[in-house]
A protein has these predicted regions:
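Interdomain hinge/linker segments and adjacent boundary elements that couple functional modules
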Residues: 1-80, 148, 158, 162-185
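C-terminal regulatory/effector modules of DNA-binding transcriptional regulators
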Residues: 84-185
C-alpha cells in the first residue's frame, strides 16, 4: 500500500484543495483516464495502472466510518472540459450524486475571488484517528509526496482555511455545479 493510501486509511478528516482538476478521490474512472493520458510520453499501461491506483484510493470514502471529507475546488475546474462536454456532464452529475453533507462536501471557490493562495498548488491535509500527527499530501505534475513535517502541514492548514473563507456555502456550490453541468448540454 502506498504512503498516501496508508494515511488516508487512518484519516478521521481529509481536507483538500484543488485549483486545476476534480480532486482524485472524487474523479470518475473516465475523468481520471483523461487526466493521466495528458502526460507526455505515458504508455497505455501506465495510464491504466494510474487509473486503477486512483480508483483504489477512493475506497476510503465508502468504507464503514469513512473520514469527513471536505473539498475546496476552484470554479475554473468545473468549466475546464476535461475529456469533452459529455464526459464533463456525466462527471459533474456523478459528483452531485456522491455529495453527502456533512460527511462529504464540496465547496467552490469562485472565479471572482481572483488570485488566491490556492494558486500555489493542490494539496490534501489528513487528520489521523488518534494515531499521530496530521499529514499532508502534495501533488505536482510529476509525483505526489506525503509529509508530516509540522511547519509544512500547518502552513497548508492556514492556506485551506483562507480558501475556505472565500468559498461558496455548500448549497450555493451544489447549485453552481448543477448549473455548469447543464451548460455542458
Amino acid at each position: 500500500m502506498s504512503q498516501v493510501r496508508r494515511v488516508e486509511a487512518l484519516a478521521h478528516t481529509i481536507r483538500t484543495w484543488e485549483p486545476m482538476l476534480i480532486p482524485g478521490l472524487l474523479q470518475t474512472e473516465s475523468y481520471a483516464r483523461q487526466v493521466f493520458r495528458g502526460r507526455p510520453g505515458v504508455t497505455a499501461e501506465e495510464v491504466e495502472n494510474a487509473v486503477r491506483f486512483r480508483m483504489h484510493r477512493q475506497a476510503v470514502l465508502s468504507r464503514p466510518r469513512p473520514p469527513m471529507y471536505s473539498a475546496l475546488i476552484d470554479e475554473s475546474v468545473l468549466r475546464r472540459p476535461v475529456g469533452g462536454r459529455e464526459l464533463m456532464r456525466e462527471h459533474l452529475a456523478k459528483l452531485l450524486e456522491v455529495l453527502n453533507p456533512p460527511y462529504l462536501t464540496v465547496r467552490i471557490v469562485p472565479l471572482s475571488a481572483g488570485l488566491t493562495t490556492g494558486c500555489l498548488g493542490a494539496f490534501e491535509v489528513a487528520t489521523l484517528r488518534d494515531c499521530g500527527p496530521d499529514h499532508a499530501y502534495l501533488e505536482s505534475a510529476e509525483e505526489g509526496r506525503v509529509t508530516n513535517r509540522a511547519q509544512t502541514v500547518q502552513a497548508l492548514i492556514v492556506r485551506w482555511e483562507a480558501l475556505s473563507s472565500m468559498a461558496y456555502p455548500v448549497d450555493k456550490s451544489r447549485d453552481l455545479i448543477h448549473e455548469v453541468m447543464k451548460s455542458y448540454g
